[in-house]
């Protein structure tokens, strides 16, 4: 199966009878917008997203050269996927190329035969069974959870898409400690503060190191206009990308509540925000 056909297959979200039966047995709730969600392998999904996850677990055949970009939603997935695509294909598409694919395409619609590049919001343990016999690489990017909130209430309750946040981030943090050659843990804030050092780190992890003489990291504008094939605007994948923007929205009481939750959930993990 070629990459494009596989992607369509993995997005086929018609609920099977098997999935409907599974959903009836799972913990269920509603998200902040009133959409029905269910908890599968410790993670909350809409019913259609769950079908896609099950399709992935059943049909995906990893290749050792695959690269998977993972994150919680709104943590820099599109940015990291664009950087990863640029790094592994820079011999074919240098950043100064006026016809670079990223100038006219969203990173999420770009396909390449090798290495294949994918992105996901699934937690590490959901990927693990599928990838257990593969040496493919996973790059995870996390971000201060206060800058990723959809709603304060859903975060505190832990009932949000691909959440709870703390369970997902811990799943990748622990995997990166257990298997640093195949799982890289990155931080959005560090990428903003020291882009050259972090991109160098990413390139080395991907076995695509930057030239030693290179003094700076070239910039490449990503296409933020147009629509994807399923009709979603490209701009829906982009936010301000500002570090600390949460201060414009959260009260001191809300900030303290979130800090207390995170301190409790990440206790003794070695991971700090």
Swiss-Prot record:
Its EC number is 2.8.2.-. The keyword Transferase applies. 3'-phosphoadenylyl sulfate binds at residues 74-79, 143, 239-241. The active site is at residue 121. The keyword Transferase applies. Keywords: Cytoplasm, Transferase. GO terms for cellular component: cytoplasm. It is an enzyme of class 2 (transferase). GO terms for molecular function: sulfotransferase activity. It is found in: Cytoplasm. Its main location: cytoplasm. Belongs to the sulfotransferase 1 family. Sulfotransferase that utilizes 3'-phospho-5'-adenylyl sulfate (PAPS) as sulfonate donor. This is Cytosolic sulfotransferase 4. It comes from Arabidopsis thaliana. The lineage of its organism: Eukaryota, Viridiplantae, Streptophyta, Embryophyta, Tracheophyta.
